């Protein structure tokens, strides 16, 4: 999303991907329905989490958003890397994306090779990643929001500044408000 020439730079394309993924079916198939669906990287049960409802599975809405963004026939999104060993879940996500025209090529890797390539920020394309640290909203965002985060591939300067500001804030209510603001962006 950080490359202005990439289709992912357009928020409508990113939203289309959200609407294209059938999370309930994935949850049933992969976890026997035991996982709680979430909308963002911060689970609703975490301290300072903004209780956002997950986007519904709506391929028609995904197609509409892609058309509005200028991709009525979809686009080639490049390589798709499922986090080892979640290959079957990655394949299901890639299939959901392909159904609305977001075409990828699945590349699987051994976990050690994946981790090395990912942490050195050498993987390009789409990554289906699994990340489950404990803590609160801030600790969950630590790997995604600041540029040095292991899952970050770019950073919005305003969001990153707000993230750093909340880390220094000692007033709990102000900190919570800042973390909620980040989750809404």
What are these regions (language model features)?
Residues 23-26, 34-37, 46-48, 84-87, ...:
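Solvent-exposed loop/turn segments at secondary-structure junctions
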Residues 4, 21-25, 30-34, 66-73, ...:
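Sec/Tat-exported extracytoplasmic proteins
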Residues 88-100:
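Short, polar/charged alpha-helical segment
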Residues 15, 27, 99-114, 119, ...:
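Extracytoplasmic/peripheral linker and loop segments enriched in polar/acidic and small residues
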Residues 28-32, 40-41, 90-92, 137-140:
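Short, solvent-exposed loop/turn and secondary-structure capping segments
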Residues 4-11, 19, 36-68, 86-88:
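Structural transition elements
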Residues 124-130:
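Paired acidic/hydrophobic, glycine-rich loop segments that form the ligand-binding mouth/hinge
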Residues 74-83:
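Short, well-ordered beta-strand elements
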């Amino acid at each position: 999303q950080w490359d202005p020439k990439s289709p992912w730079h357009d928020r409508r394309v990113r939203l289309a991907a959200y609407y294209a993924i059938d999370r309930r079916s994935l949850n049933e198939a992969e976890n026997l329905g035991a996982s709680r669906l979430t909308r963002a990287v911060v689970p609703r049960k975490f301290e300072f989490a903004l209780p956002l409802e997950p986007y519904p599975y709506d391929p028609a809405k995904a197609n509409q958003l892609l058309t509005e963004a200028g991709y009525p026939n979809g686009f080639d999104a490049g390589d798709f890397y499922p986090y080892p060993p979640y290959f079957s879940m990655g394949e299901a996500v890639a299939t959901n994306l392909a159904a609305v025209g977001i075409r990828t090529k699945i590349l699987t890797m051994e976990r050690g090779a994946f981790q090395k390539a990912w942490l050195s920020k050498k993987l390009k394309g789409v990554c289906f990643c699994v990340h489950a640290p404990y803590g609160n909203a801030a600790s969950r965002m630590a790997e995604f929001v600041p540029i040095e985060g292991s899952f970050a591939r770019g950073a919005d300067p305003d969001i990153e500044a707000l993230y750093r500001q909340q880390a220094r804030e000692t007033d709990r209510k102000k900190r919570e408000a800042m973390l909620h603001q980040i989750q809404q962006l």
